[in-house]
Amino acid sequence: MEFDKEVDASGLNCPLPILRCKKGLSDMSAAQVLKVIATDPGSVKDFNAFCVQTGHELLQLDQDETSFTFYIKKRAD
């Protein structure tokens, strides 16, 4: 999937991946896509809740043995 910016939150536990995501989205334009890589198993639930609460769209979640990759589309302001 194409993306505009990447944030690597590997090795960080809650709430740091979400905080890195919020910071990454802060200087992006509406409809741009942020790729976030995380290793915390709780991040799946956290990112789903974050997107519901903020109005950003979780476009895709990829998972392998060691990490989760989230593609988040920034909402229109």
Task: Name each region found by the language model.
Residues 18-58:
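Amphipathic, hydrophobic secondary-structure cores in small proteins
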